[in-house]
Amino acid sequence: MERGEVYDARLSPTEGSEQQGTCPVVIVSRNAINDNSPVDVIVPLTDAANVKRPYPNNVLIPAAEGGLSMDSMALAGQVRAIAVSRLLRRRGVLSADTMRAIDRALRITLDL
């Protein structure tokens, strides 16, 4: 598993407003960590049509990029670590431009 790859992941159980169920996620942790850790840091994705208020830490990803079937929104405000065993099917890889946008969104979220 590598940074920028999109996977379907089992995110439940969750609480409150956390992204839940099986949904696409993008791996954002560095490859050196991904190669040696039982967990990956991910940003969940959701159907862009479901996002009522886009925040500056959300990133629009057009359909077909990364193997996505619809326009999606990366929710950098919900960045989290998950066990590799939660990752199911690999969908594809996001472009370098999209990953730079996600990096900017993560800097906003984490005040880096």
Segments from the language model and where they lie:
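Conserved functional hotspots at enzyme active or ligand-binding sites that engage polyanionic ligands
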Residues: 1-112
